[in-house]
């Protein structure tokens, strides 16, 4: 399944990222850890669960080493009045090669806990992540600079409840991580389309169309680089 690698890596990061761990209760954290261990055991790699968790911790530290989000936020606010957002994002987009390495290391570390058929997706997943970063950092971050300048973050904050409702609807429809893993590729693509359409519809209610349009472009870009592009091509 195309999303199993993503699921395993998210579980691993969710277990060990301090910021996430403080946002959920201890029982939920343990459930995530147990699910990760079960996934590893299922594929004869129970002894690798701790390695995956350690890799996730290293990933979090890797990202923190590249980006101080408090500093970035201040730099963005300082740059807005001067129209210098492109300079801020150009500086951080220059770190994209290191970020790609962080991601590749994490996904590679997760492979022992995956079925053999899914391990074949590690390359495409890494390529997809690279393309996503390149999309965001197009022309040294022009896209994200425009997104910020056009009130993108404010739009997302304003519509956070609607976006959360979209995610909750998907969660209720799927049921569980195990149920998500059992979906066929076409079904997974359908769920992705439902979720992204719901999010776009919510963002389109903002005062400016830019955030919704950019989100739609991003979602389509991600989809085009995934197996969904061939398995369940869009009609338009």
Swiss-Prot record:
Residues 1-17 form the signal peptide. Keywords: Secreted, Signal. It is found in: Secreted. One of its GO terms (cellular component) is extracellular region. InterPro entries: DUF1397. It comes from the Eukaryota. Hemolymph. It holds the Pfam family DUF1397. Belongs to the UPF0408 family. Monomer. PANTHER family: EG:BACR42I17.2 PROTEIN-RELATED (PTHR20997:SF2). This is 27 kDa hemolymph protein.
């Amino acid at each position: 399944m195309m999303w199993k690698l993503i699921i395993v890596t998210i579980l691993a990061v969710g277990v060990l990222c301090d910021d996430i761990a403080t946002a959920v209760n201890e029982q939920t954290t343990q459930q995530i850890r147990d699910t990760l261990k079960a996934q590893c055991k299922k594929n004869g790699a129970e002894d690798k669960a701790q390695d995956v968790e350690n890799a996730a911790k290293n990933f979090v530290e890797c990202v923190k080493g590249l980006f101080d989000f408090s500093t970035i936020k201040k730099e963005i606010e300082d740059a807005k009045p001067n129209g210098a957002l492109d300079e801020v994002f150009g500086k951080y987009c220059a770190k994209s090669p290191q970020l790609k390495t962080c991601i590749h290391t994490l996904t590679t570390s997760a492979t022992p806990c995956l079925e053999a058929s899914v391990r074949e997706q590690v390359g495409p997943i890494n390529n997809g992540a690279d393309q996503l970063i390149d999309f965001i950092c197009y022309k040294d971050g022009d896209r994200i600079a425009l997104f910020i300048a056009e009130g993108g973050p404010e739009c997302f904050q304003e519509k956070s409840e609607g976006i959360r409702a979209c995610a909750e609807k998907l969660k209720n429809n799927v049921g569980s991580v195990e149920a998500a893993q059992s979906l066929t590729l076409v079904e997974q693509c359908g769920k992705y389309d439902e979720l992204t359409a719901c999010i776009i519809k919510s963002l389109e209610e903002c005062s400016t169309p830019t955030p919704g349009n950019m989100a739609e472009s991003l979602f389509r870009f991600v989809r085009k680089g995934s197996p969904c592009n061939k398995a369940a091509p869009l009609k338009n």
